[in-house]
Amino acid sequence: MLSPKKVKYRKKQRGRLSGEAQKGNKISFGEYGLVSLETNFITARQIEAARIAMTRKIKRGGRVWIRIFPDIPYTKKPAETRMGKGKGGVDHWNAPVKLGTVMFEMAGVVEELAQEAMSLASSKLPVKTMFVVRRDLR
């Protein structure tokens, strides 16, 4: 699973996401993309599940790029623990995804297969998504 090798601060405040994506909202590498239609945090496990679903569908035909990276720590205290005694340990890592972010890209396969693979990946994610072709964004 994806996670940062080294971070300046181990724990971080949660914060909120708002607005549309200003960066990472265009297809850069592949021919097809999966664009977020909602704003949310996506966990490293969800990214990995989506990647596996796509790569299994396209077999050895094409190439997949993951355009998001989980670099936000999510902390959690153990179950049945009294309040206080400091912030809990890092439970998992999240990737912030805003509306319009290109999350995955694909190339080297026909459009129908790419759409099916992206649809499978979309079902693993907690946001509504849209399949886009590079010619659509120009």
From Swiss-Prot:
Biological process (GO) annotations held by this record are:
translation
SUPFAM superfamilies tied to this protein: Ribosomal protein L16p/L10e
Keyword entries, A-Z: Ribonucleoprotein, Ribosomal protein, RNA-binding, rRNA-binding, tRNA-binding
rRNA processing as UniProt keyword:
no
Q: Where is this region: Disordered?
A: 1-21
Sample GO molecular function, one term: rRNA binding
Which InterPro entries does the entry link to? Answer: Ribosomal_uL16 (IPR047873), Ribosomal_uL16_bact-type (IPR000114), Ribosomal_uL16_CS (IPR020798), Ribosomal_uL16_dom (IPR016180), Ribosomal_uL16_sf (IPR036920)
Give start-end positions of Basic residues composition bias: 1-15
Q: Name one Pfam family in it.
A: Ribosomal_L16
Identify one Gene Ontology CC term for this UniProt entry. cytosolic large ribosomal subunit
Q: Identify the domain of life.
A: Bacteria
Entry-linked NCBIfam families: rplP_bact (TIGR01164)
What is this protein's function per UniProt? Answer: Binds 23S rRNA and is also seen to make contacts with the A and possibly P site tRNAs.
Could you describe the subunit structure of this protein? Answer: Part of the 50S ribosomal subunit.
Tell me its family: Belongs to the universal ribosomal protein uL16 family.
- What protein name is recorded for this chain? Large ribosomal subunit protein uL16
Record the organism.
Borreliella afzelii (strain PKo) (Borrelia afzelii)
| Organism ancestry | Bacteria, Pseudomonadati, Spirochaetota, Spirochaetia, Spirochaetales
Gene field: rplP
